[in-house]
Amino acid sequence: SADCCDIYSPKVVRGSMGAVFRLPFVVSDTISGFLNAHSELESYAAVVSASADKITTTPFASPCIVAVGNEGNGLKEETISACKHKITIPMEGRAESLNAAVAASIIMWEMMK
Protein backbone atom coordinates (compact mmCIF):
# COMPACT_ATOMS: atom_id res chain seq x y z
CA SER A 1 0.00 0.00 0.00
CA ALA A 2 1.05 3.62 -0.33
CA ASP A 3 2.02 3.91 3.33
CA CYS A 4 4.41 0.93 3.29
CA CYS A 5 8.12 1.02 2.66
CA ASP A 6 9.55 0.76 -0.86
CA ILE A 7 10.59 -2.88 -1.26
CA TYR A 8 13.32 -1.83 -3.69
CA SER A 9 14.87 0.90 -1.53
CA PRO A 10 18.60 0.35 -0.95
CA LYS A 11 18.07 -0.26 2.78
CA VAL A 12 15.45 -2.96 2.16
CA VAL A 13 17.50 -4.70 -0.53
CA ARG A 14 20.63 -4.59 1.65
CA GLY A 15 18.78 -5.68 4.80
CA SER A 16 17.11 -8.59 3.02
CA MET A 17 20.46 -9.71 1.61
CA GLY A 18 18.79 -10.07 -1.79
CA ALA A 19 15.86 -12.18 -0.60
CA VAL A 20 13.55 -9.41 -1.81
CA PHE A 21 14.25 -10.62 -5.37
CA ARG A 22 13.21 -14.20 -4.59
CA LEU A 23 9.89 -13.51 -2.84
CA PRO A 24 6.53 -12.71 -4.41
CA PHE A 25 5.14 -9.25 -3.66
CA VAL A 26 1.73 -7.75 -4.29
CA VAL A 27 1.03 -4.05 -4.67
CA SER A 28 -2.42 -2.95 -3.55
CA ASP A 29 -3.98 0.41 -2.73
CA THR A 30 -4.92 -0.81 0.74
CA ILE A 31 -4.20 -3.93 2.73
CA SER A 32 -7.85 -4.24 3.69
CA GLY A 33 -8.85 -4.03 0.01
CA PHE A 34 -6.45 -6.84 -0.83
CA LEU A 35 -7.76 -8.97 2.05
CA ASN A 36 -11.36 -8.40 0.99
CA ALA A 37 -10.51 -9.30 -2.63
CA HIS A 38 -8.80 -12.51 -1.49
CA SER A 39 -11.25 -13.73 1.12
CA GLU A 40 -10.43 -17.34 0.22
CA LEU A 41 -7.18 -16.93 2.19
CA GLU A 42 -7.08 -17.09 5.96
CA SER A 43 -5.80 -13.82 7.39
CA TYR A 44 -4.36 -12.98 10.78
CA ALA A 45 -3.85 -9.55 12.36
CA ALA A 46 -1.06 -9.38 14.93
CA VAL A 47 -2.38 -7.22 17.76
CA VAL A 48 -1.63 -6.41 21.38
CA SER A 49 -4.89 -7.55 22.96
CA ALA A 50 -5.87 -9.91 25.74
CA SER A 51 -8.91 -10.98 23.70
CA ALA A 52 -6.84 -12.10 20.68
CA ASP A 53 -5.91 -15.75 20.13
CA LYS A 54 -2.46 -16.70 21.41
CA ILE A 55 -0.09 -17.69 18.61
CA THR A 56 0.97 -20.71 20.66
CA THR A 57 -2.51 -22.24 20.33
CA THR A 58 -3.52 -20.91 16.90
CA PRO A 59 -3.84 -23.50 14.12
CA PHE A 60 -2.41 -21.47 11.22
CA ALA A 61 -3.79 -22.26 7.77
CA SER A 62 -1.58 -22.54 4.72
CA PRO A 63 -1.49 -20.48 2.64
CA CYS A 64 -2.37 -17.45 4.71
CA ILE A 65 -1.66 -13.77 5.24
CA VAL A 66 -0.29 -12.34 8.49
CA ALA A 67 -0.46 -8.56 8.94
CA VAL A 68 2.06 -7.03 11.36
CA GLY A 69 2.03 -3.29 12.03
CA ASN A 70 4.88 -1.00 12.94
CA GLU A 71 6.01 -0.42 16.51
CA GLY A 72 4.57 3.08 16.81
CA ASN A 73 1.08 2.72 15.39
CA GLY A 74 0.38 -0.97 14.89
CA LEU A 75 -2.14 -1.92 12.22
CA LYS A 76 -4.89 0.35 10.96
CA GLU A 77 -8.31 -0.51 12.34
CA GLU A 78 -9.59 -1.23 8.82
CA THR A 79 -6.82 -3.82 8.36
CA ILE A 80 -7.59 -5.48 11.70
CA SER A 81 -11.28 -5.61 10.81
CA ALA A 82 -10.54 -7.12 7.38
CA CYS A 83 -8.51 -9.96 8.91
CA LYS A 84 -10.42 -13.10 9.87
CA HIS A 85 -8.37 -13.76 13.01
CA LYS A 86 -6.71 -11.60 15.65
CA ILE A 87 -3.54 -13.10 17.13
CA THR A 88 -1.18 -12.03 19.88
CA ILE A 89 2.19 -13.10 21.23
CA PRO A 90 1.84 -14.05 24.90
CA MET A 91 4.39 -12.08 26.90
CA GLU A 92 5.60 -12.17 30.46
CA GLY A 93 7.04 -9.31 32.42
CA ARG A 94 6.62 -5.62 31.79
CA ALA A 95 7.26 -5.37 28.05
CA GLU A 96 4.18 -4.08 26.25
CA SER A 97 5.18 -4.82 22.68
CA LEU A 98 7.96 -6.04 20.41
CA ASN A 99 9.84 -4.64 17.45
CA ALA A 100 7.82 -5.47 14.31
CA ALA A 101 10.59 -7.61 12.80
CA VAL A 102 10.98 -9.57 16.03
CA ALA A 103 7.21 -10.06 16.32
CA ALA A 104 6.98 -11.24 12.70
CA SER A 105 9.88 -13.65 13.27
CA ILE A 106 8.24 -15.14 16.36
CA ILE A 107 4.93 -15.55 14.53
CA MET A 108 6.62 -17.24 11.56
CA TRP A 109 8.49 -19.55 13.93
CA GLU A 110 5.19 -20.60 15.54
CA MET A 111 3.65 -21.12 12.10
CA MET A 112 6.43 -23.52 11.12
CA LYS A 113 6.05 -25.76 14.19
What are these model-derived regions, one by one?
Residues 44-95:
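Active-site/ligand-binding-proximal alpha/beta "capping" segment
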Residues 40, 63-70, 106-113:
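Short flexible/disordered coil segments
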Residues 4-21, 77-113:
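Structured adenosyl-cofactor binding patch, chiefly the S-adenosyl-L-methionine
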Residues 1-51:
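RNA substrate-binding interface of SAM-dependent RNA methyltransferases
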